[in-house]
């Protein structure tokens, strides 16, 4: 059993070491798997100011070219090498201690003839002399003093009056009333009701369609221009005052009334359907 446990522990240690190595290669451990930093471009300096021109048509003098220093090449710092994984101490293999072997005793040689046992002669039994043990003188223990308690004064309690129990008077029972005897009501004689006689209501007489009488056409005479067909109503006379006004406005001439249009009824109509009514006169 102990050897099997040691083998299981060794297998677990080997598996954990393999997992740690895989994580370090994948980038989860010390510095592995991170991208290399890209080198930053060098910072540009300020632009040189242009010199003022001499005049119209003259080219400005070019300043001598400055030799720009070559930017230093960026060398990425070397990655710190991860410290080697400290190997876990292998547990000591348990070697069971050898059990002590029981000594093998050679079998005793078989005796051909068993030796005859001769019991040794017992010495005569001599009883030791019994001496009477002297008893010590009986000493009585001293009697303890008898404790007499001091007499307590008698406690006099006032007599508590016992409450008289209430006399139970039972509630008077109501008198037992017998239920009224049910007398069945007399049934009316079974007679079927006579159904009402249906009398149809009299229908109102249908109204006859009105006969169309065409209105007589007035003679086509033009009204005179001087006399209006509809005289204007007389203007309202003001109420009498203390000093009536002297100025009276002249009556305005009424405009000539337009001639009413002549109505020509349609010719094609059936005698059964009445013709449409004439339009109202136009004033």
UniProtKB/Swiss-Prot annotation:
Its main location: secreted. The keyword Coiled coil does not apply. It comes from the Eukaryota. Residues 27-283 are annotated as: Disordered. It is found in: Secreted, Primary cell wall. Keywords: Cell wall, Cell wall biogenesis/degradation, Glycoprotein, Hydroxylation, Repeat, Secreted, Signal. GO terms for biological process: cell wall organization. Residues 1-24 form the signal peptide. Residues 36-45, 70-264, 272-283 have a biased composition (Pro residues). The keyword Cell wall biogenesis/degradation applies. GO terms for cellular component: extracellular region; primary cell wall. Hydroxylated on proline residues in the S-P-P-P-P repeat. O-glycosylated on hydroxyprolines. Residues 46-69 have a biased composition (Basic and acidic residues). Structural component in primary cell wall. This is Extensin. The gene is HRGP.
